[in-house]
C-alpha cells in the first residue's frame, strides 16, 4: 500500500473509500493500486 499526502485515482476501476477518518483507494482488479492518505 502506498501512503501519500494526496491520493488520486490511477485507474478507472479505483474506488475512493473513507474508513475511520482516512481516505483509501481500493482496486480489486489491480491490488497494487492500493493507497492511503496521511
Curated annotation (Swiss-Prot):
Gene Ontology biological-process annotations: translation
SUPFAM superfamilies: Ribosomal protein L36
GO annotation, cellular component aspect: ribonucleoprotein complex; ribosome
Acetylation recorded as keyword: no
Entry-linked PANTHER family: 50S RIBOSOMAL PROTEIN L36 2, LARGE RIBOSOMAL SUBUNIT PROTEIN BL36B
Record-linked InterPro entries: Ribosomal_bL36, Ribosomal_bL36_sp, Ribosomal_L36_bact
Keyword Ribonucleoprotein: yes
Disulfide pattern: none
Family label: Belongs to the bacterial ribosomal protein bL36 family.
Gene Ontology molecular functions: structural constituent of ribosome
Keywords for this protein: Ribonucleoprotein, Ribosomal protein
Protein name as it appears in the record: Large ribosomal subunit protein bL36A
